[in-house]
Regions:
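Pyridoxal 5′-phosphate
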Residues: 1-316
Length: 316
């Protein structure tokens, strides 16, 4: 079943709305704020949330995940592709580890917002209960997303009214937004390989551009992750100072997720991936799109290198 929403934030809230006092939830701090904050809210209402203590380079170890709970969790929550690290989780391995530990895979919610339209995603093969995504991540219209719900799964509505969408989400559906999302998704799937190749070339050009300002470290997976996301720690540089300087050069980037850019606090994911505390305020996240000009991306990389070198000073 497809439930059309205003975006992945609402879809995530809808998927987590059924958490009850006393329920046990398995999760991690790799999640998007729209999941983390809803889990914190559930805790305040009496739910128990066990969070994974470590995920090197943003990749969850199936053994560690299965050991997270001593009893079968009522709900397990994971992000298919990390919005900060770009790490892609092996969901089949995680679900299998849970099944072997507790005899049943249990209920799962997957946030696939960064994955849908960029890598192959098959809801039925994932064997999960719910999956969320948002149209703007694959160049569709803003203000629309969806929650995929396995048939037979009951979820309480976030709000009630006219009972549209089989009572899951009341209110008149924005048909034109849904059609725009469907068209954008079809284009993204049809062009997926070409877009992946383009982003890989952009990534290589950008990394070549920033090479002169080493030391820096890519914090996500070195292979097998999303090729358009780069989370980089520039030692000896405060990210807030770098962001201001980069903005003056017309380079758009962030110290974390774009929708959390108003926060001055380092992302909880940085602790989870093992980054020392003294380096957590030196992290910058770059996102590359398949429609960017390769020459401009390479020039942006060179500009980043010059700015980082300037901020480090002559004795760096």
């Amino acid at each position: 079943e497809v439930v059309f929403t205003s975006g992945a934030t609402e879809a995530n809230a809808m998927a987590l709305a059924g958490i009850r006092p006393g329920d046990l939830v398995a999760a991690s701090d790799l999640e998007h704020p729209s999941i983390r904050e809803n889990l914190t809210l559930a805790e305040s209402r009496g739910a128990r949330v066990n969070r994974l203590p470590r995920a090197d380079r943003g990749i969850i170890n199936p053994h560690d995940w299965a050991a997270l709970c001593t009893e079968a969790p009522n709900l397990q929550v994971a992000t298919l592709a990390g919005h900060e690290t770009g790490a892609v989780q092996d969901m089949a391995a995680l679900i299998d580890a849970t099944r072997r530990r507790f005899g049943d895979a249990g209920a799962w919610h997957i946030d696939a917002t960064q994955a849908v339209g960029k890598i192959p995603v098959d809801f039925h093969r994932l064997e999960v209960w719910t999956l969320s995504f948002s149209a703007h991540k694959f160049f569709g219209p803003k203000g629309v997303g969806a929650l995929l719900v396995r048939r037979g799964v009951s979820l309480p509505p976030l709000f009630v009214g006219g009972g549209q969408q089989r009572g899951r989400r009341s209110g008149t559906e924005a048909v034109y937004l849904a059609v725009g999302m469907a068209k954008a998704l079809r284009m993204a799937v049809d062009d997926m390989v070409d877009r992946q190749i383009a982003c890989t070339q952009l990534r290589e050009g950008f990394l070549a551009g920033i090479a002169p300002c080493k030391p820096w470290e890519i914090l996500g997976p070195l292979a097998g992750g999303l090729n358009h996301v780069l989370l980089i720690a520039f030692s000896g540089v405060r990210s807030d100072m770098a962001l201001m300087a980069l903005d003056l050069e017309g380079i758009s980037c962030s110290a974390g997720a774009a929708c959390s850019s108003g926060s001055s606090l380092p992302s909880p994911a940085l602790a989870l991936i093992g980054l020392p505390e003294e380096h957590r305020k030196s992290v910058i996240r770059f996102s590359l799109g398949p429609f960017l000009n390769p020459d401009e991306v390479s020039m942006a990389g060179s500009a980043v290198a010059k700015i980082i070198a300037r901020l480090r000073g002559p004795h760096a």
